[in-house]
Amino acid sequence: MKTHKTKNDLPSNAKSTVIGILNESLASVIDLALVTKQAHWNLKGPQFIAVHELLDTFRTQLDNHGDTIAERVVQLGGTALGSLQAVSSTTKLKAYPTDIYKIHDHLDALIERYGEVANMIRKAIDDSDEAGDPTTADIFTAASRDLDKSLWFLEAHVQEKS
């Protein structure tokens, strides 16, 4: 993919590697934001309002992290790939079921996907650092903190005292 000139002094091979990591992560973060809204709109059952509002908070966080990730791609001279077509072909998440309604079913589906993205982002921290880009690693660290907290909140809704 063509890159644009920038005065950013990271080596070009580091930029290329990190741009790939960023765009792959961007696709899955956007996908996770979309499925979060899918659940938000369609869930039914006890605790509706609490979960409905919680998912709005998560969506806002995901949108903010997606924006930061996309902007980092461009800062490094790349092109942020956030179109529906790019997200659909690049996301690592499996398709979200559109035939579920019970809150618990949505929570289970979201827990699986939040866990996947949280793990992917943790790997992106290490991969960005190994490529020599601590700034991108820091961006992923911030996203990781929020994803882990969101995952904890989701899991707390379905876990029972043992």
Curated annotation (Swiss-Prot):
<dbReference type="Pfam" id="PF00210">
    <property type="entry name" value="Ferritin"/>
</dbReference>
<dbReference type="InterPro" id="IPR008331">
    <property type="entry name" value="Ferritin_DPS_dom"/>
</dbReference>
<feature type="binding site">
    <location>
        <position position="40"/>
    </location>
    <ligand>
        <name>Fe cation</name>
    </ligand>
</feature>
<dbReference type="GO" id="GO:0008199">
    <property type="term" value="F:ferric iron binding"/>
</dbReference>
<dbReference type="GO" id="GO:0006879">
    <property type="term" value="P:intracellular iron ion homeostasis"/>
</dbReference>
<dbReference type="InterPro" id="IPR009078">
    <property type="entry name" value="Ferritin-like_SF"/>
</dbReference>
<feature type="binding site">
    <location>
        <position position="71"/>
    </location>
    <ligand>
        <name>Fe cation</name>
    </ligand>
</feature>
<dbReference type="GO" id="GO:0005737">
    <property type="term" value="C:cytoplasm"/>
</dbReference>
<dbReference type="InterPro" id="IPR012347">
    <property type="entry name" value="Ferritin-like"/>
</dbReference>
<keyword id="KW-0560">Oxidoreductase</keyword>
<comment type="subunit">
    <text>Homododecamer. The 12 subunits form a hollow sphere into which the mineral iron core of up to 500 Fe(3+) can be deposited.</text>
</comment>
<dbReference type="InterPro" id="IPR023188">
    <property type="entry name" value="DPS_DNA-bd_CS"/>
</dbReference>
<dbReference type="InterPro" id="IPR002177">
    <property type="entry name" value="DPS_DNA-bd"/>
</dbReference>
<keyword id="KW-0409">Iron storage</keyword>
<dbReference type="GO" id="GO:0016722">
    <property type="term" value="F:oxidoreductase activity, acting on metal ions"/>
</dbReference>
<protein>
    <recommendedName>
        <fullName>DNA protection during starvation protein</fullName>
        <ecNumber>1.16.-.-</ecNumber>
    </recommendedName>
</protein>
<comment type="similarity">
    <text>Belongs to the Dps family.</text>
</comment>
<keyword id="KW-0963">Cytoplasm</keyword>
<keyword id="KW-0479">Metal-binding</keyword>
<comment type="function">
    <text>Protects DNA from oxidative damage by sequestering intracellular Fe(2+) ion and storing it in the form of Fe(3+) oxyhydroxide mineral, which can be released after reduction. It efficiently inhibits hydroxyl radical production by the Fenton reaction. Does not bind DNA.</text>
</comment>
<feature type="binding site">
    <location>
        <position position="67"/>
    </location>
    <ligand>
        <name>Fe cation</name>
    </ligand>
</feature>
<keyword id="KW-0408">Iron</keyword>
